[in-house]
């Protein structure tokens, strides 16, 4: 089953996602959190694929993705990807958690009528400047790091990035 929530970012304090476990993890010299950047997108997506399959393995409704299936979907994301709203968490340099968010592309699809046309580049540039909503596509934490505060930290990082970027 899938559930969808809406979160208005105006007035939301991402610090409420930080508790004792998160503070302890943040203070660790081994822990880092970094945005998923375009220049290292493919490397980050390899880690993301691994984290997705590992973190959802115990879910009886989850069907693991092959690397080719995940790569196909990830390559489609690159066109609209915003590095300010997605991140990888690492412990000792090893990826342990991820949050992947994408801007809402519906305004772009509506403006272009879902067709590639002469005006599409103009609509795309307009879309890049006026993104207001984002969707959390998925978040996951490697099984051996679950219940240690990683999820709260990655969510805080993504939501803070959305707020700074002007998402509502």
Regions found by a protein language model. Give the residues of each.
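Conserved active-site alpha-helix within GNAT-family acetyltransferase domains
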Residues: 1, 152, 163-166
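Acyl-donor-binding surface of acyltransferase catalytic domains
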Residues: 1-35
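Conserved beta-strand-loop-alpha-helix junction that forms the acyl-donor binding cleft
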Residues: 6-9, 141-146
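Intrinsically disordered, low-complexity boundary segments flanking structured domains
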Residues: 17-25, 120-126, 158
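A conserved beta-strand-loop-helix scaffold within acyl/acetyltransferase catalytic domains
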Residues: 35-141, 156
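Conserved GNAT acetyl-CoA-binding A-motif
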Residues: 133-134, 162-168
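Conserved acetyl-CoA pyrophosphate-binding loop and the N-cap/start of the following alpha-helix
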Residues: 145-157
